[in-house]
Structures are given as structure tokens and as C-alpha cells.
Amino acid sequence: MSGDTCLTAVCPASGAKPKTYSFKGGCLGNKYIRLNVGGCLYYTTVQVLTRHDTMLKAMFSGRMEVLTDKEGWILIDRCGKHFGSILNYLRDDTITLPKSRHEVKELMAEAKYYLIQGLVDKCQAALQDKNDTYEAVCNIPIITSPKEEEKLIESSAKPVVKLLYNRSNNKYSYTSNSDDNLLKNIELFDKLSLRFNGRVLFIKDVIGDEICCWSFYGQGRKLAEVCCTSIVYATEKKQTKVEFPEARIYEETLNVLLYETPRVPDNSLLEATSRTRSQASHSEDDEGFELRDRVRRIHVKRYSTYDDRQLGHQSAYRD
């Protein structure tokens, strides 16, 4: 076993506070010593600890008093989380800094305590680089599976707006304006995500069963759905029509902002943003069930044929 090897840190079982004894570091010599840093245990050599002019060198060259417990572990009353990284730096002057800005700050605080100026400089340079690097402020998840979608929505503390668009679901030709309207829906989604990215979680779904459909969620449940596609008839053939209900999309997006509050049951809020209750009397259980399962579905479907049927006629069609 090399004299410059530091074993992995382990955390001993909690127990009574160890009894400490005064101990002079000068009598340790160039051999392995055992360190207990905030409950994390390390093996290293005096040679590593005294290689640089730091507080550790003062401790283990006899200039400062060190304390040991009855089992011979030298006690250092600091957090041991980053002490392994500090030993690595003392050993060969190199270190792989953490990716997290917060952890780099933690490491720098420990380096300042031990008076390791070289490591402090490296941490400061890394933090400056992170300041100069612009991180994305608007990240849009793209759904890869229904299970992933469910987890995203359930775990989000924010309201959720989802846009599903998948042109491959179309069986027929598109009407003349459908491509433009599909693009307008996508562009509006991008604009809303930039405007409300700090308040609403926006997600995209490109594997769903619809061609273009908006869904709105609050406190983990679906509140509304705006389907922008329909089947129309022209010259005796079916066509798929994609529309752009801009006002309705804005309305539903503003409605989900009411759900920015913590996720607590609020029947009055759910009722205020749901469709009007039926006037018929129901039992309390029926009302609770209706409230939980109600979703506003706004299907923008208009049917027109080569005959005299008027645009906007709501008629069911079966293939």
C-alpha cells in the first residue's frame, strides 16, 4: 500500500462523544495516520499533510496541538464531505472540481479554513467561469412515454401546459390552411413558454395519438383540453383540418396560473375553473366524484360538406 494513498471515507456508527487526549503532532513521524474529520474517517501520511504550507502542515509538524480519541483517531472538527478532494490536491496539486456551483463553494470554504491558497484560487476561477457561462433559463421536456408524462405532471409543483403535435397521425390530406395553423400553435407554445417559464411547466408530446391538442393541468390533475383538429368534407372526400383557437388557448393558460399555490385541496378553485355545474341535484358523494373527474374539453370541430350543411354544425361522424 503506497504511502500517498487515501482510503475511501466511511462514517462510523453514531454513539457517545469520544474522549479526547492532548497529542503533539511532532512525534508522528513519516507514517500513516488516521483522521476523523467530522465523523468521516481517512487514512493518509504526514508527508501528504505537510507537503504544502497550510494549517494541516502546522498541525502535523508539531507547531499546533492535535487531539485524538482513545482509539488513536486524530480529530478535526470540520465537515468531512470534501476532505478527500483536499487530500487529492495536497498529494499532486490537481483536483477535479464538482460540477455543482454550490459544492464548489463548499470546497472553497474548506480550503480557506485549511489555508490552502492554491485550491482557493482554483475554486474562485471555476466560480468565475460559471458566472460567465449563460445557462438555459427555459427548458422544455419532450415526452418519450406515457409513464414519463405522468411522473412529470405528478411531481411538478407548477401548473402544466402540454402541447401534443404529431402529423404522422393523419389519415387524410390536410386542408389548405392546416399546415399554417399547426405552425401557429407551435409558435404560440414557444411564446408562452418564454413568457411564463418560471411559473408554468411547459412540455411537448410528439408521440401521442392526436395531431394537435393542448392540455392544461393544475395540482396534478387535468383541467382542460383544447383539441385543434377535426374531419371536414369537401368534394366528397375527407380532409383533416387543423385550427388555431388562440383566444381559447390564452384563456386556459391564464386559468392554470390560479394553481401556482401549494398543492392543497381547494374545491372552490377547482369549481371556479371548471365548467358550470349541472343544476340537477346530486348527492355529496356524486358531487365530489364529478369534481375530481371533470375536465373541460374544448374540441374545435367544424363540419362542412359540399351540400348545404353550415359551417359549425356539430354532427357526429362514423368511419
UniProtKB/Swiss-Prot annotation:
GO terms for biological process: cell migration; immune response; negative regulation of Rho protein signal transduction; proteasome-mediated ubiquitin-dependent protein catabolic process; protein homooligomerization; protein ubiquitination; stress fiber assembly. The keyword Nucleus applies. GO terms for molecular function: small GTPase binding. It is found in: Cytoplasm; Nucleus; Endosome. It comes from the Eukaryota. Keywords: Cytoplasm, Endosome, Nucleus, Ubl conjugation pathway. Its main location: cytoplasm. Pathway: Protein modification; protein ubiquitination. Coiled coil: none annotated. Residues 31-99 form the BTB domain. GO terms for cellular component: Cul3-RING ubiquitin ligase complex; cytoplasm; endosome; nucleus. InterPro entries: BACURD1-3, BTB/POZ_dom, SKP1/BTB/POZ_sf, T1-type_BTB. PANTHER family: BTB/POZ DOMAIN-CONTAINING ADAPTER FOR CUL3-MEDIATED RHOA DEGRADATION PROTEIN FAMILY MEMBER (PTHR11145), BTB_POZ DOMAIN-CONTAINING ADAPTER FOR CUL3-MEDIATED RHOA DEGRADATION PROTEIN 2 (PTHR11145:SF17). Component of the BCR(TNFAIP1) E3 ubiquitin ligase complex, at least composed of cul3, tnfaip1/bacurd2 and rbx1. Substrate-specific adapter of a BCR (BTB-CUL3-RBX1) E3 ubiquitin-protein ligase complex involved in regulation of cytoskeleton structure. The BCR(TNFAIP1) E3 ubiquitin ligase complex mediates the ubiquitination of target proteins, leading to their degradation by the proteasome. Belongs to the BACURD family. This is BTB/POZ domain-containing adapter for CUL3-mediated RhoA degradation protein 2. It comes from Xenopus tropicalis. The gene is tnfaip1.
